[in-house]
Amino acid sequence: MAVALTAHLQMPTMEPPDKEATVTAFETLLQEARSLDLARVDDRFRLGELAEAMRRDHPAGDLFERLAIDLEVDPGQLTEAWYVAMAFPPATRRPGLPWEIYRILRYHPERHELVSLAAHHSWDQARVERELADRFATQLGRAAG
């Protein structure tokens, strides 16, 4: 599977040496991605960060699909890891929170505040969903009032 993702990068070229350094960096990122345990929240965040680094260095339109094939994961799972990692920079992440809480909050404008509250009060997924519903109801009340 790795051949599909990296074959085009290994072809001999007359490119400047910088290209080789980029290939080496890409290979290093790919090797790290292959070693991740996606059952761990930290590793899911890391997968998203690695996907972003690869996307910046090799902006191919089908990069995530090819990477998903190489890693034998669903492309949606890879895209989700990328989006959640971009929505929650390392300084905003809280130890001990399940991935689902980050996933639920990834689009919310107050996601960093909500993650802090969830961590501080040991909220589970159901409690986070109730908080979101309460905040939405409050906003609707203000708009109607």
Enumerate the predicted regions with their spans.
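N-terminal acidic-hydrophobic amphipathic loop/helix motif that frequently occurs adjacent to catalytic
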Residues: 1-71, 116-119
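Long, compositionally biased
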Residues: 137-145
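Amphipathic alpha-helical "recognition" segments
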Residues: 44, 61-138
